[in-house]
């Protein structure tokens, strides 16, 4: 699993012997979490992997810091898999990711 945190360009790589529990994922992501729609692939170490990405629900009034690296990876996944992106030519974003983001490679 790759963990991208705000203000960090490179992921933390976490290895699990088995699938992490909901409680472990909530601890990593800072609360209840959801699937990131359209984040279906990620390039890591020169290889494009099918994936599932998770982020915190952000139900509170306090929004966590912008996660630039994860937002760029999400934009690239959308462009690669669906032909559309989040970031316009003028730099405006249709959406973004905030707080930590977990990415699992799909088998």
Task: Enumerate the language-model features and the residues they cover.
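Detector for the mature cores of small, proteolytically processed
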Residues: 1-107
